[in-house]
Amino acid sequence: MAPPTGSAPASPTPRGSRLRWDLGAEQIRSAAAQLVARTRQVYDAVGALERREVSEQNTLRALAAAELDYTVQRNMLDFPQHVSPSREVRSASTEADKQLSEFDVETSMRQDVYQRITWLQEKLDGASLKPEAKRYLERLVKLGQRSGLHLSREVQEVRRRLSASDWAKSPSRARTRGRTVPGREAAQAAFKEVRPLWGLGGGEPDLWGGGRGWAAHIVSSLPQKIKEIKKKLSVLCIDFSKNLNEDATFLAFTREELGGLPEDFLSSLEKAEEGGGKLKVTLKYPHYFPLMKKCHVPETRKRMEERFNSRCKEENCRILQQLVELRAQKSALLGFETHAAFVLEMNMAKECKTVAAFLDDLAAKLKPLGEKERAVILGLKQRECEQRALPFDGRINAWDMRYYMNQVEETQYSVDQNLLKEFFPMQVVTDGLLGIYQELLGLTFRREEDAQAWHEDVQLYTVQDPASGETLGQFYLDLYPREGKYGHAACFGLQPGCLLPDGSRLTAVAAMVANFTKPTQEAPSLLQHDEVETYFHEFGHVMHQLCSQADFAMFSGTHVERDFVEAPSQMLENWVWEKVPLQRMARHYKTGEHIPSELLEKLIRSRQANTGLFNLRQIVLAKVDQALHRQPKADPAEEYARLCQEVLGVPATPGTNMPATFGHLAGGYDAQYYGYLWSEVYSMDMFYTRFKQEGVMSPKVGLDYRNCILRPGGSVDAVEMLLQFLGRPPTQDAFLESKGLAVGPGSLPSAC
């Protein structure tokens, strides 16, 4: 694609990037081993310091410098598994990811390093540290505690109390004397205090059957047990995601079986080897979603939906069960009732009951709307079945949802998505999007010609702040699908924008990876409007990565509370529903004409279409996630089916196992999928309070947004960012109105 109009000339190499993408499989393996050795040396040096020797420079700054180097190199080695066209390189990258994940666990469990960090905290008492350095030190201590490294003191206390009791000194004699033994109650009290640390249930334990040292041995071995679990978890998460990325399942259909799909879609499909004029349809997004929205053959949609929600069913179902059980074990060892409780401690929500109340309250508000929408869909289905002489089963099936939701847009809002996409060719959308972001955030983007990347389709841009002349970083755009590539849309932070040890700033680097329809000889890549929305969303994450100006790598970019991380990019989705921005990124791919005003107005009104069902499905996914991480024995498929019926009112297809395809469960969103809805409360408040009131293209508001929300990264709490940008505590009103709901009291989040 061409650079946006008015772009500055390209420079040959990006400033500050430490990344390279020409590594072969053996080079990746070798570099991973070297990175581990180099980083371990730093940790060994810190761990060997005497108490009197620890200082900000040789402890805090040394660890920060090692973390920065490790983060950049690790990203360079494990990112290729998601994007490399070479299976060998992807495999080596996955191996490196597993090796480095194991090392991550090792470093997180360094008792010696944790001890030096706590010594430093006691020594400095925060007085001599800058605010972000103090936050970094406190976070290191907190992460150590969340790995159980603080338990050594409890271990010593338990040992002292157990050894002091007569019961512990002579268990065989004590058993014959029953409850009359002096010290027995003290020993039992000690046991009850530490029991949650190793996850034992209630009741009278056979604490002493193995001898005096048994209980103390269990407690002292906790860090090692936690370490083992964390290593297993990291490998399982990698395997879960890899299985989905590498899945190459396809179905073969005749043109008749694909009835209703446009010619440009059909002509883009490969022919199936089995012959008979059949076409290959994969389970990747660019094939799955268009088919589910437009194919009027129910049996075709049914086959696709069944296979899509059965991807990697056997292997990922086993992995998922292990994940939830191991997470529960680890959290119990650390004294948490559930894994969800462990995770939420670091989020805005803080507690499971807060999340449950939020989801229940929103579901109750949305259910009446969902019932109305289901009635409309059922009516559309009955009418179509009569017109096409198809049997009407009187129900909405999972494979009916997207098809009839699309029909709602077409019939009730007169929005023809096939016609609309002709106005969204990739080149025009990209130029418009980049122009809008530049104007809004006060930035300039320059495309780098002949830049090194992992595939010829990938393009690189440099981002500068014209006000200061500073280069903030670079971003890659990898927008089209290919075999073995990450199957969804996501932003990958590759190099943190933060301070180097010498005080200079390392520029940030990020990649947006997506799977939009590839161009053909007959037509360019044409985007559905929801794909334009996805583009805006993920690019919002890119801007978060590049605009943050944290001092430490740990706080760079999107390293904020997980239930706030989506808010900045969700807020920017609003621009694809506003008239002026839409006109800037939409022109007919043949005539160059803008979207007709009438069609544009219909599109904007259609934002309310299906909002009840869409958000109820989000609640289903969030509740499944919460259920699995609060009740690890729950069956994922059964839990999903139950919630689909109870919350959404649409049954899951028997035999499928959607949770086995739910990448978020292994991708860092465990017990946190609720965050998509939770974040939207804040994103809508930010948009309607500032941009809608002062101008959606206001450079002043855009700069405030960049400085208050994007610039801090995770160096301050999200609550503080929101207060600074909004000028008041956030409210839920804009969120409820955006869903077509009445504004009123409820259990939606209040950050302050």
Indicate residue ranges for each PLM-predicted region.
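Active-site-proximal, well-structured secondary-structure segments within enzyme catalytic domains
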Residues: 132, 136, 202-203, 209, ...
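Divalent metal-coordination and catalytic microenvironments
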Residues: 28, 152, 219, 335, ...
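A conserved hydrophobic secondary-structure block that centers on an alpha-helix together
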Residues: 148-159, 215-226, 310-322, 329, ...
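Active-site recognition of the HExxH zinc-binding catalytic motif
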Residues: 527-546, 569, 680
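C-terminal substrate/ligand-recognition segments
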Residues: 536, 613-631, 651, 655, ...
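N-terminal helix-rich structural modules
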Residues: 1-178, 183, 187-191, 202-203, ...
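C-terminal amphipathic alpha-helical interaction region
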Residues: 695-752
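Catalytic Zn2+-binding segment of zinc metalloproteases
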Residues: 336-337, 540-552
